[in-house]
Amino acid sequence: MDLIFDIEGNGLLREVSKIWMLCAEDMNTGITYDFCDYEPGCYPLREYKDLMYEAKSVTGHFILGYDLPALEKVDGFILPKEVKVRDTLLMSQTLDYMRFGHDGHSLDRWGEYLGIPKPVHEVWTEYSEEMLHRC
């Protein structure tokens, strides 16, 4: 299974103490998985580990700098070493470090470039439904 995933937490890595959700898609089948304890229809958050342990590879934007370290910090989750990791932020920076000039390589900037704006969300200390859409 090759997953693309994202998490939402209650702060930046230094402050994060709560993971609100993890959303993933199997890139081979297109099946999506939403893990969140606050929305009906989502899998319980604690079950994300079972999916991640099945993965042959995981892909995401800034997952080496935030998502994976946040999961380890908050929940003790460590991805098995044999799982391939693709961080699209690092890939973007490596392939063309000046792609957007000094605007960086954020998902916000990529969203603008591709015409798919990332939903704006500013309050991370409390859960909101908008987080699920953003994730």
Residue ranges of predicted features:
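Conserved Rossmann-like nucleotide-cofactor binding loop
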Residues: 10
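Conserved DEDDh/DEDDy metal-dependent 3′-5′ exonuclease domain
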Residues: 2-5, 13-14, 19-135
